[in-house]
Amino acid sequence: LQAFKSEVAAWMAENVPSDPGFLLPLTFLEVGTEQQLDFLREWQHKLWQAGFLGMHWPTEYGGQGADSAYQFIVDKELGRHRAPIIFNTIGLNWVGPLLLDMGTEEEKSKYIKNILSAEEIWCQGFSEPDHGSDLGAVQTRAVKEGDEYVVNGSKIWTTLGNYADHMILLARTNTKTERKYDGLSFFLSPMKV
């Protein structure tokens, strides 16, 4: 691991971008301009091309197939070198792991590599106008019609929603449950139709 840490540190010293001449966000919640988005997308893509994203994700989907300790080293070096943020957080931390664990082969092949490379941006659709962040009170409904679900409802606070290609959406698929958190399902929804 020490040799890898040295490799990452050397790469960061050479490749972490200098001041771009405009304000960079400190978290993905603060991305507010196309200029910031383009800069951060290019940075994430560069990290992925260098082999420093998805360290423990399978190689067949664009990951590195290594132990998660390697990603920890990369993350520490990113902080130590004051690198720009990795902004596709919803894709990297929620959608990707969920798909790797529960997704179909088709979904993994379609989405995982594009999450890592920042080719596609993800947002989340959990909170709703009348219930805020109380996920147990979700009113958005998903009703199965044939082979598909029809989703009806409203979402708010969809961080990165104005830039996203896809949304991970929480909807109620069963209204006849005893507990308010039962009957909820995740859906992958396109943002650009």
Features from the language model and the residues they span:
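N-terminal glycine-rich flavin-associated loop
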Residues: 87-106, 132
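Hydrophobic, small-residue-rich alpha-helical packing segments that form membrane-like cores
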Residues: 131-134, 149
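A short, Trp-centered hydrophobic/proline-enriched beta-strand micro-motif
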Residues: 118-126, 170
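A short core secondary-structure module
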Residues: 148, 152-193
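Amphipathic, small/basic residue-rich leader segments at the start of a protein or domain
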Residues: 1-89, 106, 110-117
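Short, solvent-exposed loop/turn elements at beta->coil junctions and helix N-caps
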Residues: 60, 127-131, 156-157
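A structural signal for short hydrophobic beta-strand segments in well-ordered beta-sheet cores
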Residues: 140-143
